[in-house]
Each structure stands twice: as C-alpha cells, then as structure tokens.
C-alpha cells in the first residue's frame, strides 16, 4: 500500500490537483505494479514564499 507525498506550491485548481494525482497513481502503478486502488497520494500545499529553488525564494530574483 504505497503512500506518496507530493509537496507543491499552493494555488493549483482542484482540476489540476486531480490530474496530478491521477498521473502519480498511473506512474506508480506502471513502475512498481501496485494496484491503483491501494496507491495513496498526499498533497501538501505550501505558500510560494515558503519554497526555494537554488537558494532563491520562489518568484524572487535575488537570493535570500
């Protein structure tokens, strides 16, 4: 019974989150063969200003 955590920036629509979850379930099923009915996906949404890429706050030009 796989549990997959996915941390994302807040703001995706319910439709996009649903598609993301479906894609994660599909890839997990294809990769390890688990029955899609037992694959669990947990989405964690974070404010963009709490996320960093390469040492820069998401959306900022200068490092913090």
Spans of features found by a protein language model:
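A domain-level signal for the structural core that forms small-molecule/cofactor-binding pockets
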Residues: 2-64
């Amino acid at each position: 019974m796989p549990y997959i955590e996915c941390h994302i920036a807040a703001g995706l629509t319910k439709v996009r989150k649903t598609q993301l979850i479906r894609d994660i379930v599909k890839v997990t099923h294809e990769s390890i063969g688990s029955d899609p009915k037992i694959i669990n996906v947990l989405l964690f949404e974070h404010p963009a200003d709490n996320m960093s890429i390469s040492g820069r706050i998401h959306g900022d030009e200068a490092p913090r």
